[in-house]
Amino acid sequence: MIYQVREIYMAFELHKYSLKLIKHPYWNIKCIGINHFQAMNFVHGQKYIKPYMTSKNVILRSNAYIAHLYLTTEPLDALVDYPVPLSRVNMYKVIDVLYMKHDTIPKNIANWLEAKNDTIVILGLKIMVFYNYTAASEKIVFLLDHEQIRVREEAILSIGELFLIDAEEALHNQFDKEEKLLKIEILKSLAVIGSDTSVSFITNVLKRKHLDKDVKMELLRSLKSIDNQYYDTRFILDLEIDRMKAHLNCAYL
């Protein structure tokens, strides 16, 4: 269907109109023309898009780069060296390009986790989850010590999504190093991959005093997911935990 539409697009010389938009002095009009070429899969238009891939305007540069990825026949392996930070929206656009083009996972995807650009590291993790790629599990676990919180967060999420059971102990060790947000994300991943070891870990943490209530609730939710029978029979004399369990057991409370 797209090929028929493109033939009509070219037959009526609408690509020339799109090119006029790309050459327009205003960046927002340029973006419309670029999006035309992308939507029509107008491969011959790449040469007009490429100059804007280095534009100082972030939005124009982003639109040009995504259109280039969509139109190119080259693999996305080179993206590992992309120097400019990607927004979350553009990360999902890249994944959408992979989906729409039915591309295979980049051959060097494991190297993306070592990229200097943190957003490429995050994108690499998202792509691994998209393809259910588990061959780089050690590198994913290594990212739990990354200096950037967004990278650590994505690594924690990926461990749960990819069901990396070998990362269970690493998540236990990371728990006390993180602030509230990532503590909760760790517990969500443990709810997926956790074993009896995590039951013991969570039980010990629940015995601590002065726990944040949201973290405490997530501890119980994770425990319930891993071993529901154990969850039902423990902490029955702790009034606060008992109230929280009642809330978890009944969504209407």
Model-predicted segments: where are they?
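Terminal, low-structured helical/coil segments at or just beyond the last alpha-helical repeat
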Residues: 232-253
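Short inter-helical turns and helix N-cap capping residues of alpha-solenoid HEAT/ARM repeat scaffolds
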Residues: 25-26, 56-60, 86-90, 116-118, ...
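Amphipathic alpha-helical scaffolding segments comprising HEAT/armadillo-like alpha-solenoid repeats
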Residues: 2, 9-22, 42-53, 73-83, ...
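Structured extramembrane domains adjacent to transmembrane segments
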Residues: 20-48, 53, 57-62
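Structural detector for internal amphipathic alpha-helices that build alpha-solenoid repeat scaffolds
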Residues: 2-9, 31-41, 62-73, 81, ...
